[in-house]
């Protein structure tokens, strides 16, 4: 087989298959609140695979939690913006994935906190509409109901 063919087709497929194994460790680090460790691993993967929605989703989640635990407002805002940037990219790749949609709503809600009242009202309609869709797709996910204040 041609070496170039292997490099462009076989090797990326191999690494795509191994992602599921890598995600279990990353997900464990996320659940253990090791956000900085997780971020380093995810950024390395994202450099290799910039259009992988699973990597983008986890990058968004990581930045969301870094934003939530930030002490300084500047750090909070920067991480919230990064969280939205990553999930917006994942959303553009697959807007029907329930977890992508859930975290899109969360990140959007966080970023509108800094907007004008008018913009917040406009975005709240979009957030409500998307939240209802997320609840429909993930009816057992308590986080979804929390988004809607239920």
Report residues per predicted region:
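Bacterial N-terminal signal peptides
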Residues: 6-16
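Short coil/turn linking the two alpha-helices of tandem helical-hairpin repeats
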Residues: 65-74, 110-119
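Helix-turn-helix repeat elements of alpha-solenoid scaffolds
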Residues: 29-42, 76-86, 120-126
């Amino acid at each position: 087989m041609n070496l170039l063919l292997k490099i462009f087709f076989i090797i990326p497929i191999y690494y795509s298959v191994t992602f599921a194994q890598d995600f279990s460790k990353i997900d464990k680090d996320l659940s253990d609140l090791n956000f900085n460790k997780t971020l380093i691993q995810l950024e390395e993967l994202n450099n290799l695979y910039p259009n992988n929605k699973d990597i983008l989703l986890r990058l968004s989640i990581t930045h969301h939690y870094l934003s939530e635990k930030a002490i300084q407002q500047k750090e909070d805002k920067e991480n919230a913006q990064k969280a939205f940037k990553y999930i917006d990219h994942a959303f553009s790749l697959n807007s029907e994935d329930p977890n992508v949609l859930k975290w899109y709503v969360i990140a959007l809600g966080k970023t509108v906190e800094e907007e004008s009242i008018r913009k917040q009202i406009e975005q709240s309609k979009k957030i409500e509409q998307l939240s209802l869709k997320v609840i429909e797709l993930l009816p057992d996910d308590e986080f979804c109901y929390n988004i809607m204040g239920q």
